[in-house]
C-alpha cells in the first residue's frame, strides 16, 4: 500500500483511536453543558411561598402579585444586609426573562434592584423585559436603557363615590334574584365545594388548557389562598368569582367562570356582589383588569408599533373582541391606568414581542388559532 493510500485509508487501529478520541470529546462537551446548565448557573429560584408571602405582608402586593403564587414562575430577590428588599416574578422564553407586572418590595430599592437583576441576567446571556408594567416605572426603565410600548389600560372602579357606576345593574340583579339565583361569599372556600366549582371551571374551559403566564388558573392551593364568591340556583353551583388581593385599599378579581347555559348577565351579577363585599371589607377601589390595546396609538404622531396595535384594535375583531371588552369594563370604570411592555435597548421589538406571544400561548387549545390565543392574553 502506498503512502498516499495509507493517508486516505488509514488502518483499523487509527480509525479506532480516532473514534475513542471523538467519544472522549463528546463526553467532555456533555459534561461541560451539564455544568453550564446546572442550578448554580440558573437565574433566580423557584417559589418559596412563605418567603414570598412575607414580602407581600411587609410591602403589599401589585396587580400581578397574586398570580405569582402559582409555582410556574422564577423569582429573583434583591437583598441588602441579608434581608429581602425587592422581588421580581418572571418566566423565561428564549433569551428573555419576562417579568410580570411591577416589582414588589421597598420603593427606595427598586432602581438598584433592577440594575442588579439586569447585570446578573446579562452574565447568563439573558435580557430582562417587563409585561404589564405600570406608568410609574416607565421613566425609570427608560433611564436604565429600556424601550416601551403601551399594551392597554387597566380599569379601576371607585367604591367610595355616592353614585356607583354599577347601580344601573340593579334591575338585572333583582331579576336574577327573583329567578332563584343567590350569592354566597367565602373567605376560604370549603373543601366540600371544590368539586362543584371544579365542574363549573371545566365546563367553562370547554376543553381548553389553562394558561401559564399573566393570568390565574384553577388550582386547589391557589383557589384556597383568597376569598371566593359562589352563585347558586336551586342549590346548584352555577358560577364563581375569586378575590385578587392587591393592597390594603385595592383588590381585583381573578377567575370569573359560569356554566355555559347560564344567562350572560350572571357575570355582572357576580361582579356587583363582589363590589358589595369589597365595600364591606373597606376597599377603596376595584381593579377590573386590562382592556387590551385600549387607547393605544390613537394619534397620527404615535409610535409605529402603537399605530399597528391601534389598527389591530379597530379591525382585529376576528381575533379578539377588543372594543367590546373595553365597553364591558367601561360601565364600571371611574379611571384608567396605562400598562406597558418594556424591553431592553438592542432588542428587536418584533422578536421580543414574538417571544412574549409564544410564552403567553402556552397551554392553548389546539382548535384555537395561535394569533387568537396571543391576542386574548395581551
Q: How does the language model describe each region?
A:
Residues 98-108:
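Glycine-rich phosphate-binding "P-loop"
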Residues 32-99, 126, 131-148, 159-306, ...:
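A conserved beta-strand-loop-helix scaffold within acyl/acetyltransferase catalytic domains
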Residues 14-39, 353:
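Alpha-helical membrane-embedded segments
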Residues 1-12:
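Membrane-interfacial helical/loop segments at transmembrane boundaries in membrane proteins
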Amino acid at each position: 500500500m502506498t503512502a498516499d493510500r495509507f493517508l486516505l485509508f488509514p488502518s483499523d487501529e487509527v480509525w479506532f483511536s480516532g473514534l475513542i478520541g471523538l467519544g472522549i470529546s463528546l463526553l467532555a462537551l456533555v459534561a461541560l453543558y451539564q455544568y453550564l446548565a446546572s442550578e448554580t448557573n440558573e437565574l433566580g429560584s423557584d417559589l418559596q411561598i412563605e418567603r414570598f408571602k412575607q414580602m407581600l405582608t411587609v410591602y403589599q402586593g401589585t396587580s400581578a402579585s397574586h398570580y405569582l403564587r402559582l409555582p410556574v414562575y422564577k423569582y429573583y430577590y434583591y437583598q441588602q444586609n441579608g434581608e429581602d428588599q425587592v422581588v421580581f416574578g418572571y418566566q423565561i422564553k428564549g433569551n428573555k426573562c419576562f417579568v410580570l407586572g411591577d416589582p414588589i418590595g421597598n420603593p427606595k430599592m427598586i432602581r438598584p434592584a433592577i440594575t442588579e437583576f439586569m447585570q446578573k441576567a446579562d452574565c447568563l446571556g439573558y435580557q430582562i423585559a417587563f409585561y404589564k408594567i405600570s406608568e410609574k416605572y416607565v421613566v425609570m426603565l427608560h433611564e436604565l436603557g429600556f424601550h416601551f410600548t403601551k399594551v392597554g389600560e387597566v380599569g379601576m372602579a371607585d367604591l367610595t363615590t355616592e353614585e356607583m357606576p354599577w347601580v344601573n345593574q340593579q334591575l338585572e340583579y333583582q331579576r336574577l334574584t327573583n329567578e332563584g339565583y343567590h350569592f354566597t361569599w367565602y373567605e376560604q372556600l370549603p373543601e366540600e365545594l371544590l368539586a362543584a366549582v371544579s365542574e363549573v371551571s371545566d365546563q367553562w374551559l370547554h376543553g381548553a388548557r389553562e394558561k401559564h403566564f399573566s393570568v390565574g388558573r384553577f388550582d386547589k392551593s391557589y383557589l384556597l389562598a383568597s376569598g371566593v364568591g359562589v352563585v347558586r340556583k336551586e342549590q346548584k353551583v352555577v358560577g364563581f368569582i375569586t378575590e385578587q388581593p392587591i393592597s390594603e385599599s385595592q383588590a381585583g378579581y381573578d377567575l370569573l367562570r359560569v356554566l355555559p347555559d347560564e344567562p350572560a348577565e350572571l357575570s355582572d351579577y357576580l361582579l356587583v356582589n363582589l363590589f358589595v363585599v369589597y365595600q364591606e371589607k373597606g376597599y377603596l377601589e376595584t381593579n377590573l383588569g386590562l382592556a387590551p390595546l385600549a387607547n393605544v396609538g390613537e394619534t397620527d404622531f404615535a409610535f409605529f408599533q402603537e399605530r399597528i396595535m391601534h389598527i389591530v384594535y379597530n379591525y382585529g375583531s376576528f381575533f379578539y373582541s377588543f372594543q367590546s371588552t373595553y365597553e364591558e369594563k367601561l360601565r364600571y370604570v371611574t379611571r384608567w391606568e396605562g400598562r406597558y411592555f418594556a424591553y431592553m435597548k438592542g432588542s428587536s421589538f418584533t422578536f421580543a414581542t414574538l417571544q412574549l406571544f409564544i410564552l403567553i400561548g402556552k397551554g392553548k387549545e389546539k382548535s384555537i388559532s395561535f394569533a387568537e390565543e396571543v391576542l386574548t392574553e395581551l
